[in-house]
Amino acid sequence: MDKNEIVEHLVEQWIKIAERDLLTAKQGLEADEVITDTVCFHCQQAAEKYLKAFLVKKQIEFTKTHNIMSLLNLCASDDNSFKEELSEADNLTDYAVEIRYPDDWYEPTIEETKLAYESALKVKSFVLKKLEISKE
């Protein structure tokens, strides 16, 4: 594989696992008993992975991070519209780690959970459009 093929493969992999996180969030949101912290976690994970797919495509290096604003800033170094259009997605950052452990745990409301899902969908749509990838 040449470098471009490797990049394309990695982009596909990031998107594939982002899609799985988003599907898990959707299924959790549709469940009879919504486990809001888990749904929010998967929304954050999906958004993070879509943003990382863009960074890989643009060959912008990034460190291991769950911070959505940090990732948006990196994306904005190539395309400033990321910060303009997706800055509210930073609300997902707290769902990466903080709510996963007992000392910082809280249960997001159903409204917060729906907002997290909408934010993740917006990140998905925006990134896929920028990457010129068509997915439903």
Model-derived regions, located:
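Terminal alpha-helical segments
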Residues: 1-136
